[in-house]
Amino acid sequence: MAYITVGTENSADIELFYTDQGTGQPVVLIHGFPLDGESWGKQQAALLDAGYRVIAYDRRGFGASTKAGSGYDYDTFAADLHALIEDLDLDDAILVGFSMGTGEIARYLSRYGASRIAKVAFLGSLEPFLLITDDNPDGAGPQEFFDGIAASVREDRHAFLTGFFRDFYNLDENLGSRISQEALDASVATARRAGNTAIAAAPLTWPTDFRADLAAITVPALILHGTADNILPIDKTGRKFTELVPEATYVEIEGAPHGLLWTHGAEVNEALLAFLNG
């Protein structure tokens, strides 16, 4: 098993677990909430088949990475990604983020630049800014909304996950057709491996303001979003995002929920590979 050390807490190392497979141009996969690097299974297989080197890591607090008690903010998440890229000495790398993992990309580029990066892909993104404020009146929700999510997780994370995955995969429409009960159960099991601190702190990072980071997207970019996303609605995210980064390649997947990496894996892979190979 492969780990890198990104810090310490109370004299113990904070380690990130990662997998590194294949040869060729490196692609770094950055997972969404509340999953881990293995949630990229359908994309990982397609990328390996296409001749890429595929690196997937577990964000701190999730999967097999250290269940740290702090560091749940995008400056730290970006620093963790930077540490991985530096430790593996990656050049000409492609960063592919999903959901919460898109935030790492935006903040990484603004903090560390694109000297090691060839392309970036934002799938089901958080950007540009979810919080309703005076200068962002059409955001997704006020601070109280995100505070309430975090409180629900702290109160009963297991009950929270039931409702979350219902909307994550749009189960009323997709269970039994685009996602099996077994795949859903696997997602829940993965989420239950997350640290208590991490899973409660993560929702408080979602209203991060990424607008100032977007100018740092100076490499070719893909923005891809599902039109039926009930977690990060497309009108609050993908469509606004592409207006601010008009040079990006923009793809909408009709009828796809937030969890489109699984439910619409073939469509995601087709668009992703077309972008990477273009």
Segments (PLM) and residue ranges:
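Conserved HGGG/HGGXW glycine-rich cap/lid loop of the alpha/beta-hydrolase fold
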Residues: E9-S70
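Conserved alpha/beta-hydrolase catalytic His-Asp/Glu region
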Residues: L131-I132, N136-A140, A151-A215
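Catalytic active-site module of serine/aspartate enzymes centered on a nucleophile-bearing elbow/loop
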Residues: E247-G278
